[in-house]
Swiss-Prot record:
Protein family per UniProt: Belongs to the class-I aminoacyl-tRNA synthetase family.
Binding sites annotated in the UniProt record for ATP: 623
Catalytic activity: tRNA(Leu) + L-leucine + ATP = L-leucyl-tRNA(Leu) + AMP + diphosphate
Residue window of motif 'HIGH' region: 42-52
Protein EC: 6.1.1.4
Motif, 'KMSKS' region: chain positions: 620-624
Location within or outside the cell: Cytoplasm
A molecular-function term among this protein's GO annotations: ATP binding
Name of protein: Leucine--tRNA ligase
Taxonomic lineage from the root: Bacteria, Pseudomonadati, Pseudomonadota, Gammaproteobacteria, Candidatus Palibaumannia
BP-aspect Gene Ontology terms: leucyl-tRNA aminoacylation
PANTHER family for this protein: LEUCINE--TRNA LIGASE, MITOCHONDRIAL, LEUCYL-TRNA SYNTHETASE
This protein's UniProt keywords: Aminoacyl-tRNA synthetase, ATP-binding, Cytoplasm, Ligase, Nucleotide-binding, Protein biosynthesis
C-alpha cells in the first residue's frame, strides 16, 4: 500500500477491474431477494451536470448497500435519446440529430464510468434504436385495436417556437415546459391515448403507494381532479334543444341568474346562424392565441354576447339568458356552466360587466355574509324558497334527489384529467405506425412490417418536419394498395413510460417483455428523480404499467414501490451589466475572486478581467446563469470518491445542496486522513485475533462506540435515507480511531476490526478508495462481495460508566467505574485521582452534586 492517497491512479485501475470482471452484471436468481434500483432515464445532452451526479450517486449508494446485504441488485442505465433538443442542435450545427445524439451518448457514458457507478452496462437501452421502439409501435397497435387509441381534430396546446403540440401536463402557467414560449390553442388532428379510461385506478391506487412522497401523490390527485356532481338538464325556450350543465354544487342552483356556454358549443354555433353579431364574436374569440390556462384565469378580461336564447330554470321556471363567453372550456364537463354571481368571482365580474342580476343564497354557518371570491364549502341557504335554512351538503342531496326523480338530473363523476395527446409534429421521434390509404381510410402498419424505421440521417434545414419531404419514406404499400405513412412522431414521454420494464429483458426479441424476467424484477424497489416529473413522467409511467398489466405482461399494479426526489444543486451566481448592450453578463464562479465579511457573507466580487460583479445569491446551477460546475473538472482535481462523498454529505438528499468547493476540500481531507490512518496501522505489522475476554476498558469503550456507529449508519441508510448523518458518524468514529491507543496487541486488534467495519460502511459512498483499503487490510475477497457489518448487541451493553469529575463546576478528570458503582464508591475513587486530590488538600467539601452515571461535582468551601 502506498503512503499517500492518489485517486487518479486508484480509480481508473479499479474501474477497469470492474469492467473486465463484469462485477455488476446480474441475471434473475430466484434464490435471492431482488433489489431493483433505478434513476430516471437521462437525456444525452452532451455532458453530465451536478444534478445528474447527485441523482446517480444516491442510486449507486443504495445499490451498493443492498448488494452488501446479500440481495440480487440490478441498477441499469440508458438514454432517453429522442427529442427536440437534438433537432435544435442539428439545425445549429448543420448535422443530423442522430449524429449529435450518438456522440453525446458516448461522451456521457465515459463520464458516468469515471464516477464509478455500479451499472449493469449489459442492460443499456437507447430509445432511438429500432430494436427498442419496435415494441413501442407494436404495443401502440395493440392499444389501437382495443379502442384505447384514437385520432380526432381538437383544440390542442401549440408551441409556435417549437412548432409542435404539447400535452396539458407540458404547459406550465400558459407556457411551454421546455422553451418557455407562450402557448396558443390550435385545431388540428391528433392521436390520443385514453388515459381517462384509467383515471379511477390512477387515483385510487395512489393510496397504496406508502413509499411515495405525499407531495407527489397530492399533485397527481389534484391533476386527475376527480369530482362528484350532477348533470342538470335545462330546457331551451322555443327549441327542442336542451342544455346540460355539470355542477358539483347543486345547492347553488337557486342562485343561478344566467348560463354560459363555450364559443365552440353546438348551441352557440346554432344560434350564430341567424345572428351576425354572435357569429362575429365567435370568430373573433376563437381560442387560437391563448392556452387553456389563459382562458380560465380568474383575472383575465371576460367578454361575452347574449345568444338571444333563454333556458328554463328547472326548479323555479324562471327564464335564464344564455350567453356565449370567452372563459368556458368545451373540453371540461359539458362546455356549459350555470352562473352563480352571488358566490363566484368570475361569474360576478361578468354579471357586473353586462349588468346581469346577482342573487345571494348562502350565508356562512355563523350567519354572516360570505365574500364573493369563491363558493364557501359549507353554509346555510337563504333566499332559496323551500330550501331555506338547510346546510349546503343537505341541500345538495335534496336538490339532487328532486332533479333525478324528475328525470332532469343525473349524478356524474368528472375528471380534470384529459386524454394524453401523444403525437408530435417533429422529426426526431418514434414514427407512429399508422398509414392512410388513397380513399382516406386510416389503418395500422401490419405487424410483420414493424418496426417502421425512422430515417436517421436526414438533415434539418428549418423548423419543419423533414419526414414530410421524404416521399420515398412516406409512400408505402398496404395489401397492394398505395398508402401514406403518418409523419407525426410519438411524444418522447412514450419512450420513457416503459423503459424501466424493458431493462428487465433488454435483448429479448420474442416480444415486448419477457414476462418471467419482468415479473421477477418489477416493481422497482427504489426510483430516484426530480419532483418536477410528478404530473408528467410519473403519471404516464403509472398509466403504462397498468396497460402492460392488462395486456398480460405484468402482474403488479404499480411500477415502483418507493420514490426519492432529490433536491436541486445550487451555486453562487455573479453578473455585470454590459456597457454596450445593457444586458446581464453572467460569470462563472470559478472565474471570480470574492471578499467576505466576518460572517462569511460575500461583500465584494471581481472577475478575472477586473469587472466588479453583482452577487445574485445561490441559485440552481444552469447554463443560462453560467454557474454550473463541471463534474469532470472536479473529478480530475479531487477524484470521483471525493465528489461522491461531498454530494452525499453536504445536505439531506431531499433538500437543496449548495455547492461549496471548500466543502469538497474538506471531504478530500477526510479521505486522506482515513488513507493515512490505514497506512500507519498496516505499517505496525501483523494483527492478532481480537480476544473479547481480554479487552481493556478502553477497548470495550472503543468497540461499543464502533458498534453504535454500525447501528446508526445502518439505520440512517436503510430506513431514514439520512446519508449525511451516516457519513458524519463515520467521520466521528474515524477521528476516534486516529486517537486510539496502540500500546498492546489487543489495541491493534480492535482498531483492525473497526477499520474493516468503517471501510465497508464507507464503501457505498467511496467505492474506489474502500476497494484498495479493504485489500490492504486483508479483507476477505473483493469488497464488492463483502457483507455489510453486523451489530454485536453484546458490545452495546455498557458494563462501565464514564464519570466526569468537576471541582467547583470545572472539569478536572474522568474515571471509569462499574455500572453498579454507587455514589459513595464514585466519591472514593474520584478522591484518589491525582488531578482531583491536589484540589482537595486542606479544603473541605461543602456540597456534592451527583448526576447518576454521568457526573460528580465537588463544591469546595
Amino acid at each position: 500500500m502506498q503512503e499517500f492517497y492518489d485517486p487518479k491512479n486508484i480509480e481508473s485501475t479499479i474501474q477497469q477491474y470492474w469492467h473486465e470482471n463484469n462485477t455488476f452484471t446480474v441475471t434473475e436468481d430466484f434464490s435471492k431477494e431482488k433489489y431493483y434500483c433505478l434513476s430516471m432515464l437521462p437525456y444525452p445532452s452532451g455532458n453530465l451536470h451536478m444534478g445528474h451526479v447527485r441523482n446517480y450517486t444516491i442510486g449507486d449508494v443504495l445499490s451498493r448497500y443492498h448488494r452488501m446485504l446479500g440481495k440480487n441488485v440490478m441498477q441499469p442505465i440508458g438514454w432517453d435519446a429522442f427529442g427536440l433538443p437534438a433537432e435544435r442542435a442539428a439545425l445549429k450545427n448543420q448535422t443530423a440529430p442522430a449524429t449529435w445524439t450518438y456522440a453525446n451518448i458516448e461522451t456521457m457514458k465515459k463520464q458516468l464510468k469515471q464516477l464509478g457507478f455500479s451499472y449493469d452496462w449489459s442492460r443499456e437501452i437507447t430509445t432511438c434504436r429500432p430494436e427498442y421502439y419496435r415494441w413501442e409501435q407494436w404495443f401502440f397497435i395493440q392499444l389501437y385495436e382495443k379502442g384505447l387509441v384514437y385520432k380526432k381534430t381538437s383544440f390542442v396546446n401549440w408551441c409556435s417556437n417549437d412548432q409542435t403540440v404539447l400535452a396539458n401536463e407540458q404547459v406550465i402557467d400558459g407556457c411551454c415546459w421546455r422553451c418557455g414560449a407562450p402557448i396558443m390553442l390550435k385545431d388540428i388532428p391528433q392521436w390520443f391515448l385514453k388515459i381517462t379510461a384509467y383515471a379511477d385506478q390512477l387515483l385510487h391506487d395512489l393510496d397504496k403507494l406508502d413509499g411515495w412522497p405525499e407531495q407527489i401523490k397530492n399533485m397527481q390527485r389534484n391533476w386527475i381532479g376527480r369530482s362528484e356532481g350532477i348533470n342538470i338538464t335545462f330546457q331551451v325556450i322555443d327549441m327542442k334543444e336542451t342544455l346540460t350543465i355539470y355542477t358539483t354544487r347543486p345547492d347553488t342552483l337557486m342562485g343561478v341568474t344566467y348560463l354560459s356556454i363555450a364559443i365552440n358549443h353546438h348551441l352557440a354555433q346554432q344560434a350564430a346562424n341567424n345572428n351576425r353579431l354572435l357569429s362575429d364574436f365567435i370568430e373573433h374569440s376563437r381560442p387560437t392565441k391563448l392556452s387553456e390556462a389563459e382562458i380560465v384565469k380568474v383575472n383575465r378580461v371576460k367578454t361575452g354576447i347574449f345568444t338571444g336564447l333563454y333556458a328554463i330554470h328547472p326548479l323555479t321556471e324562471e327564464k335564464l339568458p344564455i350567453w356565449v363567453t370567452n372563459f368556458v372550456l368545451m373540453d371540461y364537463g359539458t362546455g356549459a356552466i350555470m352562473a352563480v354571481p352571488g358566490h363566484d368571482q368570475r361569474d360576478w365580474d361578468f354579471a357586473r360587466q353586462y349588468n346581469l342580476p346577482v342573487k345571494n343564497i348562502i350565508r356562512n354557518i355563523d350567519g354572516s355574509k360570505p365574500t364573493i371570491s369563491g363558493i364557501i364549502p359549507e353554509g346555510i341557504l337563504y333566499n332559496s324558497g323551500e330550501f331555506n335554512g338547510l346546510r349546503s351538503l343537505e341541500a345538495s342531496k335534496i336538490i339532487t334527489d328532486i332533479l333525478v326523480a324528475r328525470g332532469i338530473g343525473e349524478t356524474k363523476v368528472n375528471y380534470r384529467l384529459r386524454d394524453w395527446v401523444i403525437s408530435r409534429q417533429r422529426y426526431w421521434g418514434t414514427p407512429i405506425p399508422m398509414m392512410t390509404l388513397e380513399d382516406g381510410t386510416v389503418v395500422p402498419t401490419p405487424v410483420d412490417q414493424l418496426p417502421v424505421i425512422l430515417p436517421e440521417y436526414l438533415l434539418i434545414n428549418s423548423i419543419s418536419n423533414p419526414l414530410k419531404d421524404d416521399h420515398l419514406w412516406m409512400k408505402t404499400n398496404y395489401n397492394n394498395n398505395i398508402a401514406t405513412r403518418e409523419t407525426d412522431t410519438f411524444d418522447t414521454f412514450m419512450e420513457s413510460s416503459w423503459y424501466y420494464a424493458r431493462y428487465t429483458c433488454p435483448n429479448y426479441d420474442q416480444g415486448m417483455l419477457d414476462t418471467t424476467a419482468a415479473n421477477y424484477w418489477l416493481p422497482i424497489d427504489q426510483y430516484i428523480g426530480g419532483i418536477e416529473h410528478a404530473i408528467m413522467h410519473l403519471m404516464y409511467f403509472r398509466f403504462y404499467h397498468k396497460l402492460l398489466r392488462d395486456a398480460g405482461m405484468l402482474t403488479s399494479d404499480e411500477p415502483t414501490i418507493r420514490i426519492l426526489c432529490q433536491g436541486m444543486v445550487l451555486a453562487d451566481s455573479f453578473y455585470y451589466i454590459s456597457c454596450t448592450t445593457g444586458e446581464r453578463i453572467w460569470v462563472s464562479p470559478i472565474n471570480v475572486r470574492v471578499q467576505r465579511d466576518e460572517k462569511g457573507n460575500i461583500i465584494n466580487a471581481i472577475d478575472l478581467q477586473g469587472h466588479h460583479l453583482v452577487y445574485a445569491g445561490t441559485i440552481k446551477m444552469s447554463k443560462s446563469k453560467n454557474n454550473s460546475i463541471d463534474p469532470l473538472t472536479m473529478v480530475e482535481k479531487y477524484g470521483a470518491d471525493t465528489i461522491r462523498l461531498f454530494i452525499m454529505f453536504a445536505s439531506p438528499v431531499t433538500m437543496a445542496l449548495e455547492w461549496r468547493e471548500s466543502g469538497v476540500e474538506g471531504a478530500n481531507r477526510f479521505l486522506k486522513r482515513l488513507w493515512k490512518l490505514t497506512y500507519d496501522h498496516i505499517q505496525r505489522g501483523k494483527v492478532i485475533k481480537l480476544d473479547l475476554a481480554a479487552m481493556s476498558n478502553d477497548n470495550k469503550i472503543l468497540r461499543r462506540e464502533l458498534h453504535q456507529t454500525i447501528a446508526k449508519v445502518t439505520d440512517d441508510i436503510s430506513r431514514r435515507y439520512a446519508f449525511n448523518t451516516a457519513i458524519a458518524a463515520l467521520m466521528e468514529i474515524t477521528n476516534k480511531l486516529m486517537h486510539a491507543s496502540y500500546h498492546s496487541q489487543q489495541d491493534r486488534a480492535i482498531v483492525q476490526e473497526a477499520l474493516l467495519a468503517v471501510v465497508r460502511m464507507l464503501y457505498p459512498f467511496t467505492p474506489h478508495l474502500c476497494f484498495k483499503l479493504w485489500q490492504a487490510l486483508n479483507g476477505e475477497g473483493d469488497i464488492d462481495n463483502a457483507p455489510w457489518p453486523i451489530v454485536d448487541q453484546l458490545a452495546l451493553v455498557e458494563d462501565t460508566n464514564l464519570i466526569v469529575i468537576q471541582i467547583n463546576g470545572r472539569f478536572r478528570s474522568k474515571i471509569i467505574v462499574p455500572v453498579s458503582a454507587d455514589k459513595a464508591l464514585i466519591i472514593e475513587r474520584a478522591s484518589k485521582e491525582k488531578l482531583v486530590a491536589k484540589y482537595l488538600e486542606g479544603t473541605k467539601v461543602q456540597k456534592i452534586i451527583y448526576v447518576p452515571g454521568k457526573l460528580l461535582n465537588l463544591v469546595l468551601k
